[in-house]
A protein has these predicted regions:
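Phosphate/diphosphate ligand-binding glycine-rich loop within oxidoreductases
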Residues: 46-118
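A short, aliphatic-rich alpha-helical micro-motif
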Residues: 42-43, 61-63, 169-173, 255
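N-terminal glycine-/charge-rich "phosphate-binding" loop or analogous flexible N-terminal tail
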Residues: 1-45
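Glycine-rich adenosine-cofactor-binding loop
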Residues: 14, 95, 103, 121-142
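NAD(P)-binding Rossmann-fold cofactor-contacting core
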Residues: 143-160
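Rossmann-like dinucleotide-binding domain for NAD(H)/NADP(H)
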Residues: 205, 212-390
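Rossmann-like adenosine-cofactor binding region
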Residues: 56-57, 155-252
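Phosphate-coordination loops involved in phosphoryl transfer and adenosine-cofactor binding
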Residues: 7, 121-124, 196, 212
Length: 397
């Protein structure tokens, strides 16, 4: 059986971009904030498109006429998949849509925290999760010459160049970044996979070596328990949080203790948002023509401004150039300041939503072209390994 999406009623989260691919399918559309999407709001809706702040479960969907529900996000921890399937609905997500953006966020965080030099000099990076984001981050780091160790019991085959280890071993590395998907499925449930015991292991490992440690969570807040986070905040670890236990609420004492914080925007580049919409459009098209509506692969993003002229510092060495390039493209200082400007008493859900809605989405730089005033072979090499293209003024003469 086929359906015509333009003949159906849609309800769409107000932050989902109406890209040309998605707009071409839309019929009668209602737009509203994600937290305002209720059972009453969807009672006469056929297609429901949400983001991560809207729980989609039997309580929401039962009694509605929803036929298709999609999330424009990579993660599906806000979906009760069993309940959706039990109701006989078709659903889809956008895995990988935000991967490039999160990779860029983590790389710039290494520069902002002054850990970039250490990892380029041999300090290993431990990754928890090697899916769409973790796998791409590992590949990028390896191209830069960084030693990468990872834990992910669900990845097969194992990616070349990544040291395979158990969770406890990965958590003993000086730099740790979380990228596991959040789920409760046995035997490798990831919710609170880092509890207070694991955090204490991290602190003990840090105490046995010179220097501190860097912990980044740009994945899901509930991958760790509140107690585990508190253990780290009370230690010498430098903590960077884009997401945290109990999100969206952020207690004032946590805000006072964390080193760097941003309001869950690591994956929110302009291109990531567009990819999410385009992937949903592809799934809706397949569903409407009677095909399986499994999530599609990330599509090519819309054109964005060239980076030419934004990276012309060639007087320094390649390592200094790399550091400066990443600092120039970091959103972390700006976002940390925005969060703290809301008040050190902490954040409410309304505060959190306001910060995200006013986020100035950056353009991704991966795959873009930069211009060097004078072509330097070492800088060209490190830029290429970072993931950008290089041109020089001498090529235009």
């Amino acid at each position: 059986m086929t359906v015509e999406p333009r003949d159906l009623r849609w309800l769409v989260d107000d932050v989902i971009p109406h890209t040309p691919a998605l707009s071409a399918l839309m019929g009668d559309v209602t737009v509203m904030p994600g937290r305002a999407i209720t059972r009453d709001a969807i009672s006469d809706i056929d297609i429901l498109l949400v983001r991560s702040i809207t729980p989609v479960n039997a309580a929401l969907l039962s009694g509605s006429r929803v036929q298709f529900v999609g999330t424009a996000t990579a993660g599906i921890d806000h979906f009760d998949v069993a309940a959706i399937n039990e109701l006989g609905l078709t659903w889809s997500a956008a895995p990988g849509s935000n991967a490039v953006s999160v990779v860029e966020y983590v790389l710039t965080a290494l520069a902002e925290t002054e850990w970039l030099t250490a990892v380029l000099s041999g300090s290993p990076v431990g990754l928890v999760g090697l899916g769409q984001v973790g796998g791409r981050l590992a590949a990028r780091l390896i191209r830069l010459g960084v030693t990468v160790m990872a834990y992910d019991p669900n990845i097969e085959p194992w990616p070349a160049g990544v040291v395979k280890a158990d969770l406890n071993t990965v958590l003993q590395q000086p730099v740790i970044s979380l990228h596991a998907s959040l789920h409760d499925s046995a035997p490798f449930a990831s919710r609170e996979m880092i509890a207070a015991e694991q955090a204490r292991t991290m602190v003990s490992a840090q105490a046995s070596r010179q220097g501190g440690g860097l912990f980044i969570n740009a994945g899901r807040g509930d991958l760790m328990s509140p107690e585990a986070l508190q253990v780290l905040l009370e230690s010498r670890w430098t903590v960077v949080l884009d997401t945290w236990p109990g999100e969206p609420v952020l207690e004032g004492d946590m805000l006072a203790e964390v080193n760097w914080i941003s309001p869950h925007i690591a994956g929110h580049s302009a291109q990531a948002r567009e990819r999410g919409s385009d992937m949903l459009a592809a799934s809706i098209s397949r569903w409407s023509t009677g095909q399986a509506a499994a999530a599609s692969q990330p599509s090519a993003s819309t054109p964005r401004p060239s980076l030419e002229g934004l990276a012309t510092r060639t007087s320094a060495g390649a390592a200094d150039w790399l550091m400066q390039f990443l600092l120039d493209h970091s959103v972390l200082p700006r976002e940390d300041a925005r969060v703290r400007a809301h008040g050190m008493a902490g954040l409410s859900a309304a505060d959190f939503d306001a910060l995200r809605s006013r986020y100035a989405q950056p353009n991704e730089w991966t795959g873009e072209c930069i211009k060097l005033v004078e072509r330097d072979p070492e800088i060209t090499d490190v830029a290429t390994r970072l993931g950008v293209l290089v041109s020089g003024e001498e090529e235009e003469r």
